[in-house]
A protein has these predicted regions:
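Rossmann-fold NAD(P)-binding glycine/threonine-rich loop
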Residues: 86-96, 105-143
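A short hydrophobic/small-residue beta-strand
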Residues: 99-101, 381
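N-terminal glycine-/serine-/threonine-rich beta1-alpha1-beta2 phosphate-ribose binding loop
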Residues: 1-96
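Glycine-rich phosphate/pyrophosphate-binding beta-alpha loops
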Residues: 294, 298-304
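A conserved regulatory-domain signal marking ACT and ACT-like small-molecule sensing domains
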Residues: 309, 314, 318-438
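Low-complexity, glycine/alanine/valine/leucine- and proline-rich hydrophobic stretches
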Residues: 264-289, 303-304, 375-392
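Substrate-binding/catalytic subdomain of NAD(P)-dependent oxidoreductase enzymes
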Residues: 179-276, 281-283, 302
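Rossmann-like NAD(P)H-binding beta-loop-alpha module
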Residues: 120-201, 208
Length: 438
């Protein structure tokens, strides 16, 4: 049988890894796919780099649009990143009847609805396992492995850079700024780390997972996003003393009022497996009504872990290449005409527990004033610690953990607490999730 002909867009870190894995494991891959998979041509703006990497094993070009129009190409693999040019290339490939494999989370989060509709009309597939959590097969699990379940919630560590920073802050007692500089030196953080440390990258991935889990359109603009740049080593230490660890989580949950979509630092009980995921690793908890909680763990980035997911998609597309489109797994797991328009819950309506840290004057009556404000908002306290003042200091830290309460209530309480003359500066608020069976 004639090999499937692949056009590869981009031969950078992931593109190079994909080319390497596909050639190194060619025999195993073809046995699994049922036919050979051949990278016929590689397009890259740096033609010299492309030629140096592929040698005589594939054609090279710097004209990506010519590649996606070639009649001899069956599958286009998009690994150039960005949203503008990548979107145009993918839509052109689809228009020309090509199946597409992509690792482009930002593109799908922003334009996935348009891309999937175009693919549906042309009867081609868009595969995107590598777009979320690198080598962790979470898309496959959500689309197929958990298809018998009504997904209740997902909570994941889905950005390795942020997880590395938080792990180092906890283990070494370092400040955020110091660990960020170290992460950049080690190559774990970009020169401009904004997407990673402010939760944008995680929000892209959460958008995709929520769409598959609940059969809703991609809605990146409705994800509440808060990063880790304001976290202090003191908060990480206090959380540890209380039996918790702080992780940047992407959380989506089905509720009676709508779907939660949120990315933010979160206290998790130290006893949970996901709380012990360290360094640049990723982990995703998925709760299904039948299966209960399931955990997916692995490398969320890197050349070959991500290439593993890209090549897995190539094998899937190759297997289904000649299948009737009606027999294929839908892009977002649900049949296109059965997608739901469930409302996205506003952040102020989300119910969770909270960690609060206040810097206050060490005077009688201060605690009574604060607890009175919390009681006025029907917020009950689960645990509280008052730290001893340092030598010569007049201020102390008070740390509180609340029971479940609505975000709007905690916001109103914080506003009133910060107006008290005995309270110094802003109240630190970090959300808390138990992540048990419920």
């Amino acid at each position: 049988m004639k090999p499937i002909q692949v056009g590869l867009l981009g031969i950078g870190t992931v593109g190079g890894g994909t080319f390497s894995v596909l050639h190194r494991n060619q025999e195993e891959i073809s046995r699994r796919a049922g036919r050979g998979i051949l990278i016929k041509v590689v397009a890259d703006k740096d033609l010299a780099r492309a030629r140096a990497m592929v040698g005589d094993r594939a054609e090279t070009t710097d004209d990506a649009f010519a590649l996606v129009r070639r009649p001899d190409i069956d599958i286009v693999v998009e690994l150039i990143g960005g949203t503008r040019i990548a979107k145009d290339l993918i839509l052109t490939a689809i228009e020309n009847g090509k199946h597409v494999v992509t690792a482009n989370k930002a593109l799908l989060a922003h334009h996935g609805n348009e891309i999937f509709l175009a693919a549906q009309k042309k009867g081609v597939m868009v595969a995107f396992e590598a777009a979320v959590a690198g080598g962790v097969p979470i898309i496959k699990a959500l689309r197929e492995g958990l298809t018998a379940n009504r997904i209740e919630w997902i909570a994941g560590i889905i950005n390795g850079t942020s997880n590395f920073i938080l792990s180092e802050m906890r283990e070494k007692g370092s400040s955020f700024a110091d660990v960020l500089a170290r992460a950049q030196k080690l190559g774990y953080a970009e020169t401009d780390p904004t997407f990673d440390i402010e939760g944008v990258d995680a929000a892209h991935k959460l958008t995709i997972m929520a769409a598959i889990a609940f059969g809703i359109p991609m809605q990146f603009d409705k994800v509440y996003t808060e990063g880790i740049s304001r976290l202090t080593k003191e908060d990480i230490r206090y959380a540890e003393e209380l039996g918790y660890r702080i992780k940047l989580l992407g959380i989506t949950r089905r509720t009676a009022k709508g779907i939660e979509l949120r990315v933010h630092p979160t206290l998790i009980p130290s006893k949970r497996l996901i709380a012990n995921v360290e360094g640049v690793m990723n982990a995703i908890l998925v709760k299904g009504d039948a299966v209960g909680p399931t955990l997916y763990y692995g490398a969320g980035a890197g050349a070959e872990p991500t290439a593993s997911a890209v090549v897995a998609d190539l094998v899937d597309v190759t297997r289904m290449h000649t299948a009737d489109p009606e027999q294929r797994v839908p892009h977002l797991a649900f049949q296109p005409d059965r997608m739901s328009d469930l409302p996205i819950l506003a952040m102020e309506d989300v119910e969770t527990a909270y960690y609060l840290r206040l810097r206050v004057l060490d005077r009688p009556g201060v605690l009574a004033d604060i607890t009175r404000i919390l009681a006025d908002q029907s917020i009950s306290i689960d645990a509280m610690v008052q730290k001893e003042p340092g030598e010569g200091e007049e201020q102390v830290d008070i740390i509180m953990l609340t029971h479940l309460t609505v975000e709007k209530s905690i916001n109103d309480a914080i506003t009133r607490i910060e107006s008290l003359p005995v309270v110094s500066g802003k109240v630190t608020r970090i959300r808390l999730e138990e992540l048990g069976r419920n």
